[in-house]
Amino acid sequence: MPPKSTEPDYRPSYLAAAITSLVVFSIYLATLAPSTAMWDTSEYISAAYVLGIPHPPGNPFFVLLGRFFAILPLGALSVAVKINILAALTSAVAAGMWFLITERILVNWLPERWQRITGAALAALIGATEFTVWNQSVVNEKVYTVSLMGLAIISWLTVRWSDDPDGPKADRLLVMIAYLLGLGYANHMMGFLAGPAVVVAVAVRRPQTFLRWKLIVISVGALLLGMSPFLTQPIRAAHFPAINEGEPTTWNAFLYNFNRGQYGKPALLDRQAPYFDGQLGMFWMYFRWQWLRDVKVQYPAIQSILAMVYMLLGLMGGYVHWKRDRKSFWYFGTFMLTLTFVLIYYLNFKYGHSQCTAMGNPPDVNCEVRDRDYFFIVAFSAWGVWSALGLVYIWEGVASLFGS
């Protein structure tokens, strides 16, 4: 049944969302990388092509999906370009999901359908054209746009569930969400980032769900089924593909790969850089990049102004979201908190590479070997939803001043 709203005949504008996704996809295709690129790009393109195992944990869902794109009969396109198209397509689908979520939020305060579609299109286009999102969407540097798509789909399904948690489709939606969480984990650990927000949404909207053991068992089963691509790793490893990192042909080797044992991550309380000056400072640096980034020429003053405007728009949008649609805010607000402050704390990065460069590369400071803005691709993309809500709120205020 359609979610309850102030507009009884509300229907998600799937056609408008699809058109928006197509526009975003066209932008990415027009700027698509013609081949491979730096860092992990070649490793992952090659691993997908040979059904191999890239560095732990091996990202088996991406490998399977990438292999599918690698063998598509797309004329004379190289394997690299085909897999770059995968990045563009998955990111464009994510933009469509942000469109649907934004439109749903706006149902509670914009009476006209065209107004909601305009606001939703703004959210999708803003999120899709940020530096990190665009950069990852035109060359398959790794697995992050697949994670972005998965988390955006989970977000849309959770918003739909929150509208009618007692409806006939509610349990099926939760099982599907659990499956997608598991499948997302088989792509990258990032796929679990929606989990805490889903739990909060269920706890607020229908807490008795946690007492329904049959649904919980089925959901856990769906979660494990989603993670089943990991079972392909020992099979492929036994065939010794050209890329076979960790060679997980035994149970111990498989667990070592699955648990990312080679990285030796320090305890969370053992901070590799100060949380505020170092790690939050690194996030703010990456946030500043989103609307003005040039690898040759930097404009720190203009960057900071644009970033502050974008930050304030998002905070305004988040506040309006809380005031006007609590049902979806419980999920989306927790999701944004997880993608930012919680994720920054959990990742526990050293000083960012560009931070160290700006500090003159002091020998006594531990620095990351590269900039890792891609870990926050979902946060930057989803922030487009709140920034669009902020723009709509300003638009509404200006319109009221002129009596329209």
Q: Residues of each region from the PLM?
A:
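Loop-to-helix entry region of an early transmembrane alpha helix in multi-pass inner-membrane enzymes
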Residues: 60, 64, 75-96, 100, ...
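Membrane-interface alpha helices of multi-pass inner-membrane proteins
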Residues: 47-50, 123-124, 172-187, 199-201
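Aromatic- and kink-enriched transmembrane "portal" helix at the membrane-lumen/periplasm boundary
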Residues: 29-33, 76-84, 109, 113, ...
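Transmembrane-helix signature of polytopic, membrane-embedded enzymes
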Residues: 14-19, 98-129, 165-172, 329-330, ...
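Transmembrane-helix motifs of polytopic, lipid-linked glycan transferases
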Residues: 85-110, 153-157, 312-316, 385-388
